[in-house]
């Protein structure tokens, strides 16, 4: 039997996942992180993108988060996310439209233009689209 760690994924809407996993793979502020049992304690920011859980038996489950924090303790991993969606629920066409809308907003700067907000919307939409495309490429869906 593989060694596991307890993982919780929570957002403002509530608990999204709680269970034992062999590994958690997330996109941290300084790059990708792979967390397994025995990982050193850690708290880090998470960028928008996929969170991949490798469950017991090797089954993978993927979620999209819009950002948040990751806390690692000796027997527990906790993801505190701004928003979470199961990757299977993401729609590629909607993600592409969001990228186009964000790019258009960046190109059509008005008097009250907020560059930081527009850039954040573009980064989130692009991360969501990347997540959908990665899943389609890996699982052929």
Swiss-Prot record:
InterPro entries: ATP_F1_dsu/esu_C_sf (IPR036794), ATP_synth_F1_dsu/esu (IPR001469), ATP_synth_F1_dsu/esu_N (IPR020546), ATP_synth_F1_esu_C (IPR020547), ATPsynth_dsu/esu_N (IPR036771)
Family: Belongs to the ATPase epsilon chain family.
PANTHER family from the UniProt entry: ATP SYNTHASE DELTA/EPSILON CHAIN, ATP SYNTHASE EPSILON CHAIN, CHLOROPLASTIC
HAMAP family documented for this protein: ATP_synth_epsil_bac
Function: Produces ATP from ADP in the presence of a proton gradient across the membrane.
UniProt-listed Gene3D superfamilies: ATP synthase delta/epsilon subunit, C-terminal domain (1.20.5.440), F0F1 ATP synthase delta/epsilon subunit, N-terminal (2.60.15.10)
Subcellular location as annotated: Cell inner membrane
Record-linked SUPFAM superfamilies: Epsilon subunit of F1F0-ATP synthase C-terminal domain, Epsilon subunit of F1F0-ATP synthase N-terminal domain
Keywords: ATP synthesis, Cell inner membrane, Cell membrane, CF(1), Hydrogen ion transport, Ion transport, Membrane, Transport
UniProt name for this protein: ATP synthase epsilon chain
Entry's Gene Ontology molecular function annotations: ATP binding; proton-transporting ATP synthase activity, rotational mechanism
Disulfide bridge map: none
Major location (coarse): membrane
């Amino acid at each position: 039997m593989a060694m596991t760690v307890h993982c919780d994924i929570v957002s403002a809407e509530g608990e999204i996942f709680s269970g034992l996993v062999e590994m958690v793979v997330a996109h941290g502020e300084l790059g990708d992180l792979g967390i397994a049992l025995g990982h050193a304690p850690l708290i880090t920011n998470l960028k928008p993108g996929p969170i991949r859980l490798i469950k017991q038996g090797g089954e993978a489950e993927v979620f999209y988060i819009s950002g948040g924090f990751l806390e690692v303790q000796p027997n527990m991993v906790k993801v505190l996310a701004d928003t979470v969606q199961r990757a299977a629920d993401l729609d590629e066409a909607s993600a592409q439209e969001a990228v186009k809308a964000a790019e258009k907003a960046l190109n059509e700067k008005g008097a009250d233009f907020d560059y930081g907000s527009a850039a954040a919307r573009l980064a989130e939409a692009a991360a969501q689209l990347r997540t959908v495309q990665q899943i389609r490429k890996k699982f052929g869906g």
